[in-house]
Design a protein with these regions (language model features):
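Helix-start/capping segments and mature chain N-termini
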Residues: 1-24, 43-181
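Ordered, amphipathic secondary-structure segments that act as subunit-interaction surfaces
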Residues: 27-35
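Short, internal active-site loops enriched in acidic
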Residues: 37-42
Length: 181
């Protein structure tokens, strides 16, 4: 299922705009967030055809999602009481409405003294972290949850491609907390 919004720019136009934003912000590397949103010409749930399609590109320096200490020593995680949505609203797009669950999950984790939350699907299997895909590497095998309840985005696809290039076996399967041990 697609969200059915026609972006009025080509991939080439968007790529050039992202490069220009990085240059304007004096960034050699950083985080780029292109967003697509509908205008305000009309109100209501059925007014999509009457609304303009807008695109904005933000970029900023962001050295790492976790601090360097976390990379060296690991982080503490908790099992979130918040359940992950079915394949984020049946779309392989990042949709802002699906972040509500993740925000509640990570805030709950922090209130419990952990750095991150792991969300489960409706069947009790691991879906993903509050802001990241989850991968386990054991015995030259990369394991990751199926895409039924996680975002199958660029990052996930890139990690899988890199793992295959490194000759790791890649297994997409239902994962439990016991698999993390």
């Amino acid at each position: 299922f697609k969200i059915n919004i026609s972006i009025p720019y080509s991939i080439s136009d968007l790529t050039q705009a992202q490069k220009a934003a990085m240059i304007k912000n004096n960034l050699q590397e950083g985080y780029i967030r292109p967003i697509v949103f509908l205008g305000s010409e009309s109100m209501g749930l059925r007014s999509q055809d009457a609304l303009s399609v807008n695109v904005a590109i933000a970029c900023w320096e962001w050295p790492s999602y976790m601090d360097p200490e976390a990379k060296r020593n690991g982080i503490s995680v908790v099992k979130s009481p918040f359940q992950q949505y079915d394949n984020p609203l049946y779309s392989n797009n990042k949709i802002i409405g699906t972040y509500v669950n993740s925000i509640m999950a990570v805030n709950d984790a922090i209130s419990k003294g952990a750095e991150e939350a792991i969300l489960l699907d409706k069947n009790g299997f691991i879906s993903e972290g509050s802001g990241e895909n989850l991968f386990i590497v054991k015995n030259s095998k990369l394991m990751t949850p199926t895409t039924d309840y996680c975002l199958n985005g660029i990052t996930r696809q890139s990690v899988i491609t890199i793992a295959k290039n490194l000759k790791l076996t890649v297994e997409e399967k239902n994962l439990t907390f016991e698999d993390l041990l």
